């Protein structure tokens, strides 16, 4: 039992909820490879650091000898997951889904062991349900139970439309667990309802219910909302090392600790020691550099991490980038000159244009050559001259 306690403690690290822990202990006691499921709808072509929180947990299960099933929702991706959404998500075409799925398959192996990963597509069984099967599946849940879900409840109360296919989505995801006979399903905290539907459907099918394991959502570069490509507050796992380094160094000191908790493989005791050192006067930038290097080494190499650090020092620290700077958020695309003016970095758009012409404007340490640049969804550090800095998020 002591071995199980050690394994359980490791598996619970960074986890928000385990439903239920008693079920997980019982499954671990069976001393067999458990089927660990993670589903992902390929709604965008790139995987970002937010996705890696659950992928890292999958890899941990692999290291303990369990069978990892990475489910690509090529069928459900055409439906659109409503989790956490305040409006109906537009479904993707099959062509978009399949194109994005190919990219997913390449990128997940930056974390998962390809020899120990089984990739499946849920169209293999959901595509065969037919009308009769879909009606039978829908009969497992009532509209009242669906409206217990927070996002549906909010939209219903605010008289926002909820499409019928959005009610179907949790049932399709739950049916995936039945088809795979999953022992454990991982997901973000916004997936809790869907994971619990899987437990219910497995019980109805005469299977032992899966353990639902939820992990916190990684907050993006803006320090406010979950990391998302659509919000521009993300770091892709295929981003260049220098870009990764600059973006990680741009996050706030408070957010850095959340990222350590969710992204770092360092022992918890070492992270606690870092916190104590910063509390006692150590520059948090030094600790942030260690986080940046750890993440870059994982997706590129240690040599790339060292080079990116040196490049950052050459670009930023010699320019004395401050530890703290003003932060701004703008909605919708905005011209660079207007952004600099609204962020208080220049007095007018004409001054912004003049500073660009004089090589006095930088974005993440890179000189800007075109004053007519339009800034879309993103988070960057903007510098004007030697001493004016601002962290700006465009959504």
UniProtKB/Swiss-Prot annotation:
S4 RNA-binding domain spans which residues? 334-394
One molecular function GO term is:
ATP binding
Query: Which Gene Ontology cellular component terms are annotated?
Result: cytosol
Question: What chemistry does it catalyse, as a reaction equation?
Answer: tRNA(Tyr) + L-tyrosine + ATP = L-tyrosyl-tRNA(Tyr) + AMP + diphosphate + H(+)
* Gene Ontology terms: biological process: tyrosyl-tRNA aminoacylation
Where along the chain is ATP bound? 229
Where does it localize? Cytoplasm
**CDD domains xrefs:** S4, TyrRS_core
Coiled-coil annotation reads none
Q: Which Gene3D superfamilies match?
A: HUPs, RNA-binding S4 domain, Tyrosyl-Transfer RNA Synthetase
Q: Which residues cross the membrane?
A: none
Q: Does the keyword Ligase apply?
A: yes
**Main EC class of this protein?**
ligase
Top-level taxon: Bacteria
Listed NCBIfam families: tyrS (TIGR00234)
Extract the HAMAP family matched here. Answer: Tyr_tRNA_synth_type2
Task: Spell out the family assignment given in the record's similarity comment.
Answer: Belongs to the class-I aminoacyl-tRNA synthetase family. TyrS type 2 subfamily.
The record ties this protein, via PANTHER family, to: TYROSINE--TRNA LIGASE, TYROSYL-TRNA SYNTHETASE
- UniProt-recorded name of the protein: Tyrosine--tRNA ligase
Task: State the gene name recorded for this protein.
Answer: tyrS
């Amino acid at each position: 039992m002591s071995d199980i306690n050690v394994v359980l403690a490791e598996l619970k690290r960074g986890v928000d909820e385990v439903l239920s822990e008693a079920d997980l202990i019982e499954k671990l006691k069976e001393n067999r490879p458990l089927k660990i499921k993670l589903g992902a709808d390929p709604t965008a072509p790139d995987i970002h650091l937010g996705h890696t929180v659950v992928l890292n947990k999958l890899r941990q299960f692999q290291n303990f000898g369990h069978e990892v099933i990475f489910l690509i929702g090529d069928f459900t991706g055409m439906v659109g997951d409503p989790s956490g959404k305040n409006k109906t998500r537009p479904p993707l075409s099959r062509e978009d889904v399949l194109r994005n799925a190919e990219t997913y398959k390449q990128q997940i192996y930056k974390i998962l062991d390809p020899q120990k990963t089984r990739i499946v597509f849920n169209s293999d069984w959901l595509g065969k349900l037919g009308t009769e099967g879909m009606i039978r599946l829908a009969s497992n849940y009532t509209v009242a139970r669906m409206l217990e879900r927070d996002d549906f409840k909010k939209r219903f109360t605010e008289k926002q439309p909820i499409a019928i296919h959005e009610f179907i989505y949790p049932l399709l995801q739950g049916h995936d667990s039945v088809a795979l006979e999953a022992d454990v399903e991982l997901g973000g905290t916004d997936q809790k309802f869907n994971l619990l539907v899987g437990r219910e459907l497995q019980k109805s099918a005469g299977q032992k219910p899966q353990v639902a394991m939820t992990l916190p959502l990684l907050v993006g570069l803006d320090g406010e909302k979950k990391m998302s490509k659509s919000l521009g507050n993300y770091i892709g796992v295929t981003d260049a090392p220098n870009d990764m380094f600059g973006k990680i160094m741009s996050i706030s000191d408070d957010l850095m600790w959340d990222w350590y908790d969710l992204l770092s493989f360092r022992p918890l005791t070492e992270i606690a020691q870092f916190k104590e050192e910063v509390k006692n006067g150590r520059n948090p930038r030094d600790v942030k550099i260690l986080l940046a290097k750890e993440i870059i080494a994982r997706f590129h190499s240690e040599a790339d991490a060292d080079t990116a650090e040196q490049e950052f020092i050459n670009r930023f620290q010699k320019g004395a980038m401050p530890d703290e700077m003003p932060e701004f958020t703008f909605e919708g695309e905005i011209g660079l000159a207007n952004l600099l003016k609204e962020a208080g970095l220049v007095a007018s758009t004409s001054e912004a244009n003049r500073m660009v012409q004089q090589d006095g404007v930088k974005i993440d340490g890179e000189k800007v050559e075109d004053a007519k640049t339009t800034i879309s969804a993103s988070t960057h550090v903007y510098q004007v001259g030697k001493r004016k800095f601002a962290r700006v998020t465009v959504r």
